[in-house]
């Protein structure tokens, strides 16, 4: 009845997530309201590697105009770099979801901003379930906003 899940905190999340991210074969969907240069320095090389393997990457975030000061410029620059790699970037006003769906088989969801986390107490749950991943894709209506390859 229940899918097996694994819990991570701010200290254990990225090791597991980056391993799974590198093993993704078809598609990566990330929803994260904030994007910072510091986090992107870690993730951009992985995104680049995955794009060279023709892995589809879709990121849903806030429009940079919703950020103030330095966060505006960090988001704007990161989005430019992501788009240069061929990453599809979507904007949702007031966005605050924090999740990732890998190959429509693995879900990560919780409180951690995947593209910006720096220094706070967080929780993320990994669910390895094709059924849960497809249900979440339907719930966030990703196929309506980002066409499949």
Predicted regions mapped to residue ranges:
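Cysteine/selenocysteine-centered motifs that mediate thiol-based redox chemistry or coordinate metal-sulfur cofactors
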Residues: 134-149
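Conserved beta-strand termini and adjacent loop/short-helix elements that scaffold enzyme active sites
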Residues: 8, 60-62, 92-94
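Acidic/glycine-enriched edge-of-secondary-structure segments
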Residues: 1-9, 29-35
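A short, well-structured juxtamembrane/interface segment
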Residues: 9-17
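A conditional alpha-helix N-cap/helix-loop micro-motif detector
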Residues: 10-11, 37-40, 89
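Primarily the HKD phosphodiesterase
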Residues: 19-84
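A short, polar/proline- and glycine-enriched secondary-structure boundary/capping micro-motif
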Residues: 41, 70, 118-122, 145-149
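HKD (HxKxxxxD) catalytic microenvironment of the phospholipase D
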Residues: 28, 87-133
């Amino acid at each position: 009845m229940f899918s097996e899940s694994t819990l991570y905190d701010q200290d254990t999340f990225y090791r597991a997530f980056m391993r799974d991210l590198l093993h993704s074969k078809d598609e990566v969907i990330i929803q994260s309201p904030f994007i910072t240069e510091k986090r992107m320095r870690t993730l951009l090389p992985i995104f680049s590697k995955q794009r060279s393997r023709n892995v589809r990457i879709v990121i849903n975030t806030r429009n940079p105009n919703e950020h103030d000061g330095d966060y505006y410029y960090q988001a704007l620059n990161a989005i430019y770099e992501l788009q240069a790699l061929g990453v599809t970037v979507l904007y949702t006003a007031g966005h605050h979801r924090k999740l990732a769906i890998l190959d429509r088989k693995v879900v990560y969801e919780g409180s951690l901003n995947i593209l910006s986390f720096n220094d706070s107490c967080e929780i993320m749950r990994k669910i390895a379930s094709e059924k849960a991943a497809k249900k979440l894709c339907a719930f966030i209506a990703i196929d309506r906003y980002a066409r499949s390859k």
